[in-house]
Swiss-Prot record:
Identification of the protein by name: Ribonuclease HII
Organism this protein belongs to: Thioalkalivibrio sulfidiphilus (strain HL-EbGR7)
Reaction catalysed by this enzyme: Endonucleolytic cleavage to 5'-phosphomonoester
Cellular compartment(s): Cytoplasm
Top-level taxon of the source organism: Bacteria
UniProt gene name: rnhB
Length: 202
């Protein structure tokens, strides 16, 4: 069965995650089952949308979809099981949290999480499958909001502007302040900063 045929099936969930690359904060996944009777215009990969457009689409997706759910893995879980496994687990949690059980899941990327229904990985799915685009949008909006909250809890790193990604501002703050509780110690720049802080203490 090809992608066009899958897209025509009822009860197909689109699944995507955001936040694999950042040095801080959770990885967040979403699963969305769109309602064919309530189409949403402008769905595309969240990275290609402005923040304001993502926010507007987030509202529409939540209002018009048959079901949506979010799942995440914390920095501690990421450090324990690695970022790839944490991304898959976050996606699994999102699908399992759906109020409607999908007949099939279409997952962005080249790997599928462990699911109790048929699942297919779709390369560049966030640009090709509307339900995956919708999942990428609500996952991105939710994660950005979490990072704004973490910025208030852990000031000085600029988490609310770079969302935890390894920008020069973030790396400089890590060097100066050391890691916060929301940083991922398994990521090399964070680990090096933690080791330098340990050396400085002694």
């Amino acid at each position: 069965m090809d992608l066009e045929a899958w897209l025509g099936l009822p009860g197909v969930a689109g699944v995507d995650e955001v936040g694999r690359g950042p040095l801080a904060g959770p990885v967040v996944a979403a699963a969305v089952i769109l309602d064919p009777a309530r189409p949403i215009d402008g769905l595309k990969d969240s990275k290609k949308l402005s923040p304001a457009r993502r926010e507007a689409l987030d509202v529409q997706i939540r209002e018009r979809s048959l079901a949506f759910a979010l799942g995440l893995c914390t920095p501690a879980e990421i450090d324990r099981i690695n970022i790839l496994q944490a991304s898959l687990l976050a996606m699994q949690r999102a699908v399992e949290a759906l109020s409607h059980r999908p007949e099939m899941a279409l997952v962005d990327g080249n790997r599928c999480p462990k699911l109790t229904m048929t699942a297919h990985a779709v390369i560049k799915g966030d640009s090709r499958v509307p339900a995956i685009s919708a999942a990428s949008i609500i996952a991105k909006v939710h994660r950005d909001r979490l990072m704004l909250a973490l910025d208030e809890q852990h000031p000085g790193y600029g988490l609310g502007s770079h969302m935890g990604y390894p920008t020069p501002v973030h790396l400089e703050a890590l060097e100066r302040l050391g890691p916060s509780p929301c940083h991922r110690l398994s990521f090399a720049p964070v680990r090096r900063a933690a080791e330098r802080m340990q050396v400085a203490l002694f």
